[in-house]
């Protein structure tokens, strides 16, 4: 009968995602790049997920996202995808 019920050498993907970025088995960042599509003109803008400034559309100037001190908060009509 094992004393520990959790395998420390082979953690599950769910437990790795919950762990702090420096305490994971292989340290990985929490940030990523986004492609945001403007709902007004359809242009795509590439930005960082933790941007510190307001993101505006490059063509029409409509605001696409607001900084929150952490992750970027997108406007409700914007569609996005994570770049890999």
UniProtKB/Swiss-Prot annotation:
Transmembrane segments: none
Zinc fingers typed C4-type, residue spans: 38-60
GO-annotated molecular function: RNA binding; structural constituent of ribosome; zinc ion binding
Known cofactor(s): Zn(2+)
Presence of keyword Nucleotide-binding: no
Gene3D superfamilies found in the cross-reference section: Zn-binding ribosomal proteins
Cofactor note: Binds 1 zinc ion per subunit.
Record Pfam families: Ribosomal_S27e (PF01667)
Keywords from the named record: Cytoplasm, Metal-binding, Ribonucleoprotein, Ribosomal protein, Zinc, Zinc-finger
Annotated localization: Cytoplasm
An example Gene Ontology biological process: translation
Record-level GO cellular component terms: cytosolic small ribosomal subunit
Principal localisation: cytoplasm
Subunit organization: Component of the small ribosomal subunit.
Function (record text): Component of the small ribosomal subunit. The ribosome is a large ribonucleoprotein complex responsible for the synthesis of proteins in the cell. Required for proper rRNA processing and maturation of 18S rRNAs.
Annotated family: Belongs to the eukaryotic ribosomal protein eS27 family.
Record-given protein name: Small ribosomal subunit protein eS27
Organism: Entamoeba histolytica (strain ATCC 30459 / HM-1:IMSS / ABRM)
